[in-house]
Structures are given as structure tokens and as C-alpha cells.
């Protein structure tokens, strides 16, 4: 009796399908390659501005179309030692046409909130005397009544009046004067004294 021994073939037989599967898996693994995605550099994102609910509160000054705030400067020249006169602030301020005949006629109401009165001396060192001045906040006085406040003719000086001192807290009708400053010198008529330089700040409302 003869015995037949069947040896398995590595490249065939039972083990051959397993080898083929492994080889096919390796081939697939080799075929699959990682894909690298290259993206173009994007544009920077625009940041949206936050719109606050109180944007109006950041605005300063008087809203357009409702009012205005202006500053006027005028001078009174060629004053002598015994000069006297007055500034009536309002529609009677003839020394400042830009205010009297200009912007004041464009509004129904106004108030002067600040007055700077400066005396610029042009007197010689040999001159003597002074110029007294007085504030009348209600335009009731027509001539100088007090000699307490003075400018020395040879030195000059300045005086600032705020709103509460010049009746400038409340609004005034554009046809009414607000206040007055009077002055009078005690020097000689032959002596040159100098000039006044006046700066006023005006608020206006209710345009015509």
C-alpha cells in the first residue's frame, strides 16, 4: 500500500488566495496617497464698526439748523485821555456791524455768554490818568455811576465777564439789548490813550 503525500504550494493551493489578498491590499495602500489641499491666502476680514446707540451724545456744539455759536471781535480806536462812551450789547451794538446787522438778524433769540474787555495802551510814558468802566447788566444806566474799576492809561489791562454777570444765562429776543458797559477817562483831551478791544461769545437759536 502506497501513501501519497500532498505538499502545499506557497504560490498556489490553499495559501495562494491569502497571499493575493495581502498583495492587493498593499497595492491599494500604495496607490492611495495623501492629498494636500493648498488654499490661496484669503483677504483680511473687514471689521464692522459698532454703531452705538448714543452717537448723538458725542457731537458737541449746537445741532445744525437749530442754533449757532459765534465769536466776534471789534475795536474802539483813537481814545483820548478824557474819553467817555458805552457799549450796548445787542441790536444797538453799532461798533460791531457783523453782529448787529449780520447774524443777529437771522435768529429770533440770542444770549451773549462772555465778554472780554481789553484796553490797549498807546499813551506816552509822560501821560497820566485812567479810564473807569462799569457794567450795567440790565441797560438801566446811561452814564458812568461808579469809578471803582479802572484802566491806567499808561498800562492797559483786561476784564472778563461771564454769563451770570452780564445777564447772559437766559435767552433774549433779538430785538432787545442784553447789557451795557460804560467808561469815562479823567486824563487830558490832548493825550492819546489807546483803544478798546472787545471779544464776545454769542449763542443763537430759533433761526428766522
From Swiss-Prot:
Alphabetical list of InterPro entries matching this protein: Luteo_coat, Viral_coat
Basic residues bias locations: 18-30, 44-61
Family: Belongs to the luteoviruses capsid protein family.
Chain residue ranges for the region called Disordered: 1-68
Organism, scientific name: Potato leafroll virus (strain Potato/Scotland/strain 1/1984)
Record's protein name: Major capsid protein
Domain remarks: The N-terminus like those of many plant virus capsid proteins is highly basic. These regions may be involved in protein-RNA interaction.
Coiled coil: none
Keywords: Capsid protein, T=3 icosahedral capsid protein, Virion
Described function: Major capsid protein that self-assembles to form an icosahedral capsid with a T=3 symmetry, about 23 nm in diameter, and consisting of 180 capsid proteins monomers. Most of the 180 monomers are the major capsid protein, but a small percentage contain the minor capsid protein, which has a long C-terminal extension.
Ranges of compositional bias, category Low complexity: 1-17
One GO location term (cellular component): T=3 icosahedral viral capsid
Amino acid at each position: 500500500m502506497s501513501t501519497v503525500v500532498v505538499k502545499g504550494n506557497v504560490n498556489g493551493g490553499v495559501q495562494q488566495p491569502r497571499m493575493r489578498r495581502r498583495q492587493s491590499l498593499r497595492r491599494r495602500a500604495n496607490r492611495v496617497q495623501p492629498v494636500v489641499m493648498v488654499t490661496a491666502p484669503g483677504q483680511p476680514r473687514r471689521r464692522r464698526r459698532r454703531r452705538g446707540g448714543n452717537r448723538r451724545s458725542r457731537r458737541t456744539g449746537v445741532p445744525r439748523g437749530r442754533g449757532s455759536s459765534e465769536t466776534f471781535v471789534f475795536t474802539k480806536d483813537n481814545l483820548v485821555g478824557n474819553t467817555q462812551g458805552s457799549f450796548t450789547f445787542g441790536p444797538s451794538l453799532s461798533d460791531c456791524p457783523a453782529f448787529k446787522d449780520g447774524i443777529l438778524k437771522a435768529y429770533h433769540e440770542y444770549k451773549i455768554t462772555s465778554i472780554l474787555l481789553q484796553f490797549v495802551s498807546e499813551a506816552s510814558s509822560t501821560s497820566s490818568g485812567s479810564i473807569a468802566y462799569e457794567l450795567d447788566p440790565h441797560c438801566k444806566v446811561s452814564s458812568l455811576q461808579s469809578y471803582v474799576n479802572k484802566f491806567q492809561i499808561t498800562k492797559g489791562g483786561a476784564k472778563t465777564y461771564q454769563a451770570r454777570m452780564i445777564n447772559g444765562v437766559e435767552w433774549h429776543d433779538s430785538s432787545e439789548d442784553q447789557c451795557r458797559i460804560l467808561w469815562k477817562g479823567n486824563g487830558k483831551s490832548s493825550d492819546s490813550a489807546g483803544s478798546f478791544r472787545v471779544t464776545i461769545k454769542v449763542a443763537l437759536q430759533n433761526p428766522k
